[in-house]
Swiss-Prot record:
It comes from Streptococcus mutans serotype c (strain ATCC 700610 / UA159). Residues 80-83 are annotated as: Involved in Mg(2+) ion dislocation from EF-Tu. One of its GO terms (cellular component) is cytoplasm. It comes from the Bacteria. The keyword Transcription does not apply. Associates with the EF-Tu.GDP complex and induces the exchange of GDP to GTP. It remains bound to the aminoacyl-tRNA.EF-Tu.GTP complex up to the GTP hydrolysis stage on the ribosome. Keywords: Cytoplasm, Elongation factor, Protein biosynthesis. PANTHER family: ELONGATION FACTOR TS, ELONGATION FACTOR TS, MITOCHONDRIAL. It is found in: Cytoplasm. PROSITE patterns: EF_TS_1, EF_TS_2. This is Elongation factor Ts.
């Protein structure tokens, strides 16, 4: 029988990340052959990963890495928030972002086939992490963002990496600091798209209906305390404000000023403010979902678009990942697991 020394166990642990007892058992089983022990642990790790494959992993972290004119953002999931703070998990997330930024894969399959600094594939790294950490660790998604030489990246991670953002700006007065500030805005305000031009007519119609339903509910409450009803929204996006609609709004304002007896010589001073209010009141969908139409959190006197124009800058693109978005968390996973274990025991 081979002599399994502490130094041998330590070496195997350093190479595989296995626990002390797992490393020792593997060495004993293969009579101290390091190569066979590594292979054995990998096989056992794959078996452990397979057993955990159907679990829901909805916690985790985002990772962001910038490499010249290419930036990568990734989401990696674990089953619990506790594991998401594990140093091995954090290192895996960061390495995943770096490997993807440098390798530029087209999809998840290509990403998982990329090699890590240790020489293994990313897929093998995830199998190993699942085995050694003891939870299902899964690579969920990534996005690659490219920029031109004269453009700048902004990278920001919020709440310890629960939200990750990459922005791209261009303009003589834009820099990484401004791009990062905009990334902070994106993290906080969660826009869905850059411009109102990206919203479909159906989406605007549905959102407007929901907003008006909320106004109707509020009006019922206002009526109970003798407050005047709020008007329903007719429009929700700049895309609906055609030249004819805008011209009619201006005519309505002029008619209102005339009815109020305001002298025509001061109309030019009043109309711009009222038209600005008209646009504000009739672009509520844009303000909620489009970055350029949102009020900029660093200067609440301007929209993002207006602020960027004031510094001769332009937003080219952005990507925002939030951990777990779109994943349905099963609250009774643990209960189901216990029940399944008990059922299996009774059927033996």
């Amino acid at each position: 029988m081979a002599n399994i020394t502490a130094a041998l166990v330590k070496e195997l642990r350093e190479k595989t990340g296995a626990g002390v007892m797992d490393a020792k058992k593997a060495l004993v089983e293969v009579e101290g052959d390091m190569g066979k022990a590594i292979e054995l642990l990998r096989e056992k790790g794959m078996a452990k990963a397979a057993k955990k494959a159907d679990r829901v992993a909805a916690e985790g972290l985002t990772g962001v890495y910038v490499d010249g004119n290419v930036a990568a953002i990734v989401e990696v999931n674990a089953e619990t928030d506790f594991v998401a703070k594990n140093a091995q998990f954090v290192d895996l997330v960061n390495e995943t972002a770096k490997v993807i930024a440098e390798g530029k894969p087209a999809n998840n399959e290509e990403a998982l086939a990329l090699k890590t600094a240790a020489g293994d594939t990313l897929e093998a790294a995830y199998v190993n992490a699942t085995a050694t950490i003891g939870e299902k660790i899964s690579f969920r998604r990534f996005a690659l963002v490219e920029k031109a030489d004269k453009q700048v990246f902004g990278a920001y991670q919020h709440n310890g990496g629960k939200i990750g953002v990459i922005t791209v700006l261009e303009g003589e007065n834009t820099d990484e600091a401004l791009a990062k500030q905009l990334a902070m805005h994106v993290a906080a305000m969660n826009p869905s798209v850059l411009s109102y031009k990206e919203l479909s007519e159906e989406f605007i119609h549905d959102e407007l209906a929901q907003m008006n339903h909320k106004i109707e509910q509020d009006n019922e409450s206002r009526a109970m305390v003798d407050k005047p009803a709020l008007p329903l929204l007719k429009y929700g996006s700049k895309g609906q404000l055609t030249d004819e609609v805008v011209a009619q709004a201006e005519e309505d304002i002029k008619a209102e000023l005339k009815a109020e007896g305001k002298p025509e010589k001061i109309w030019d001073k009043i109309i711009p403010g009222k038209m600005a209010r008209f646009f504000l009141d009739n672009t509520k969908v844009d303000q909620q979902y489009t970055l350029l139409s949102q009020v900029y959190i660093m200067d609440d006197s301007k929209t993002v678009e207006a602020y960027m124009e004031s510094v001769n800058g332009k937003v080219i693109s952005f990507v925002r990942f939030e951990v777990g978005e779109g994943i349905e968390k099963a609250a009774n996973d643990f209960e189901n697991e216990v029940a399944a274990t008990m059922a299996a025991a009774l059927n033996k």
